């Protein structure tokens, strides 16, 4: 049986990536310095982060401790990534600069591409790759 999903102004259909971070992580200051706002944070008994919801200019995402029981590990343990977080922003250069100042590692500087995008890429302190982008043509 197929069911149609109708979004209202109150409940829009959107993606909210869940980024896995190492177990026993206590500090996510990078994301706050990068411009994220914390909505909520659930901590384990030892104070480490279980899950936190963050938002950057309306784009919601979650950080969650590693859950190896179903194969979810963070990029550092995996020695690589299987996806890239694409974030569309009004000013690619400003966001790239802010990320680098907050502690990210630049993978590729912001530049214009023939396919009509301005893009730059960085790796955050937990190993996640972010593609910062804007349509330009």
Task: Mark where each language-model region is.
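Vicinal oxygen chelate
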Residues: 1-18, 29, 34-88, 96-123, ...
């Amino acid at each position: 049986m197929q069911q149609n999903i109708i979004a209202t102004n109150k409940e829009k259909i959107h993606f909210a990536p869940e980024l896995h971070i190492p177990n026993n992580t206590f500090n996510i200051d990078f994301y706050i310095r990068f411009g994220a706002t914390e909505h909520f944070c659930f901590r384990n008994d030892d104070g480490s982060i279980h899950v936190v919801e963050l938002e950057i200019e309306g784009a919601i995402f979650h950080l969650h401790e590693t859950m190896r029981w179903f194969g979810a590990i963070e990029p550092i343990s995996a020695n690589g990534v299987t996806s890239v977080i694409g974030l569309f922003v009004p000013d690619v250069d400003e966001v790239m600069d802010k990320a680098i100042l907050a502690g990210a590692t630049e993978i590729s500087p912001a530049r214009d591409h023939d396919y009509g995008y301005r893009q730059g890429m960085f790796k955050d302190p937990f190993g996640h790759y972010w593609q910062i982008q804007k349509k330009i043509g």
